[in-house]
Amino acid sequence: MAHKKAGGSSRNGRDSAGKRLGIKAYGGEYVIPGNIIARQRGTTWHPGLNVGMGTDHTLFAKVEGRVEFRAKANGRTFVSVLPIAAEAAE
């Protein structure tokens, strides 16, 4: 008859890899259509002008331009892409 309890394995020791969420293009940065601006879970940032939102809430640029973050009075932060003026391209 054993007089010592069998040693059990630890029930801890599991962790998931980081998901690389966050802002990928900051305010004032130049983006082209399709560039990812932010990866998020839920709507920490909301899409504004010329910004689309994917099924996983990823924000992406729809046009070429500069990224702008703007806080509204209701507490929401909107991300927009301001197109570069047509005169600057000529």
Swiss-Prot record:
NCBIfam families: L27 (TIGR00062). InterPro entries: Ribosomal_bL27, Ribosomal_bL27_CS. Transmembrane segments: none annotated. GO terms for molecular function: structural constituent of ribosome. Belongs to the bacterial ribosomal protein bL27 family. The keyword Ribonucleoprotein applies. The gene is rpmA. One of its GO terms (cellular component) is cytosolic large ribosomal subunit. Keywords: Ribonucleoprotein, Ribosomal protein. This is Large ribosomal subunit protein bL27. GO terms for biological process: translation. It comes from the Bacteria. PROSITE patterns: RIBOSOMAL_L27. PANTHER family: LARGE RIBOSOMAL SUBUNIT PROTEIN BL27M, RIBOSOMAL PROTEIN L27.
